[in-house]
Amino acid sequence: MPRPDRISSATLDYLRNELKPLVGTQFRILSLPVKALQAFEPSQVGTIVGTLMDACIPHLEGIPQVGLKKHEGILGDREGYPDYKHSSGLRVELKLLYIDNPTLEMKRPPTRREPSARLTQKVTVKNVNPATDAMLLIAYRLEPQAENPSLVSPTIFDFEVFSMIELVEARDRRLLACGGRWFGDYETPTILSRVGKAKLKAGLALDDTSYGRKESEGKDYNEDTNFGKLQRIPHAGLKAFLNKNREFLEVSEATNGQADPTA
């Protein structure tokens, strides 16, 4: 039974329909020569273009029919949450997913890398409004410009919207299921270090008074540098969207060789 204090599937359907005009949008302000792509790996281009896309996202406001306006944010200017406010009053956090375009000639390595898109620790149960907040996940790829095929630009070809509170809860459940924990009031997510795992296996008490940033510090917990990667969040809807394009995602180095207990 739907919870009245949470964004409903009907509301997400409404938002999804409102945002449909985004599909096909091409950011020609970012133009790359097709020939230059041959020297780059997809992951390298994704990093470069993704950074530039973040800077150009305010241009989405130039599509009035979708009703998105930049939100003032509640966490400061650069890292403000959420990114947008919809004309309906819904709040939208934007995430970008780079998809490799197999029709473009690039330097493709034999080993793929895990997508870097993530739901970071800046978004927690403390600042998410369960009734109004959604995540907009935009899948984009480089496509030739119609007027000048020798140039390619990032182009939105698919998107999905999700309940933000559901994603945050799924992300945090995975952290705990893997033996991790939060330090502070949802400030720093940590995972067991090699020392911590050894102590746990030996039945010894863990020291949860501090954490480290690297193994050499000898702490029982280390900061989780992979926290919130979308590929690792056990949410059925999110996984279904990622699976649609799995063939062209950078999907290796999954869980540092460990099974995901929540998968």
What are the language-model segments listed below?
Residues M1-P82, L96-A263:
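Nucleic-acid endonuclease domains
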